[in-house]
Every structure is written in C-alpha cells, then in structure tokens.
Regions:
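Feature captures the catalytic cores and cofactor-binding loops of soluble hydro-lyases/lyases
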Residues: 3-18, 23-126
C-alpha cells in the first residue's frame, strides 16, 4: 500500500498497529442495534454508514453512543472475523473503549476526524 498523506498524533486507547481503508462517519455509532455483530454491516436506519460493512476498515467516527452491551458487539465482531482493523474517534467513551480493549482492536482518539474521508489509507501505530 502507498504511504499515507497525513500524520496525526492521538491518544492511545488500545495499543497496536493497523493499516487499512478509512470508513468515516460524521455521526456517533451505537453498536448494539446499530451494527450486526455477525456480519459487521451498519444496520441503524438513517445512519450515514447504513448498509456499509466495518470489517477490516479503519472505522472513524466522533464517539460512541448507546448501551453498554455495545462493547460485547465489538467483541462479537472480532470473534466472527468481522471487526474493524482499528477505531479512530474524536473523543472516546467507555463503551467503545472497553469493546476495543476486549476485542483487541487498536484504537486512538483526540484526532481531527473532519480531516479524514472514506477511502483514505490510514496507518495506526500505538
């Protein structure tokens, strides 16, 4: 893959390295009821990513929302081989942070996500 065009320093939530295509949402994501835990497809009606699959992508969104069970949906995605390669948030919150930790998904926050677009090549090192 080619080298990324931009470089940001964020706060590491779950250490690790990852590389992949960005899948960017301007809206928060709620994993319980918003993402199918077996397929990785965003199912929340009206969400900007509705119908898109998070598997293998660097998932970029402002913050999480919804039930604490959302952490386990991230774990379910990992167990099914359908997890995102990494997560980038503007500001993390406990639901997504715990999910990333238990699912071993590299995660950072405090990144200016408005500078990122779906399809960008992203590399995380943390």
């Amino acid at each position: 893959m080619r080298e990324p065009d931009l470089c940001f320093v964020g706060r590491v939530i779950k250490a690790g390295t990852a590389e992949g295509e960005a899948l960017v949402s301007s809206e928060p994501i709620g994993f319980l009821g918003g993402v199918d835990g077996e397929t990785g497809v965003v199912t929340e009606r009206g969400h900007p990513l509705e119908g898109r699959c998070v598997a293998g992508k660097v998932l970029v969104f402002p913050t999480g929302k919804g039930s604490t069970v959302g952490s386990y949906v991230l774990y379910q995605l990992a167990a099914a081989g359908r997890a995102p390669a990494a997560i980038v948030n503007a500001e993390s919150e406990p639901i997504v942070a715990v999910g990333a930790i238990i699912a071993e998904i590299p995660m950072v926050d405090r990144v200016p996500i408005e500078a990122l677009e779906t399809g960008d090549l992203l590399q995380l090192e943390g």
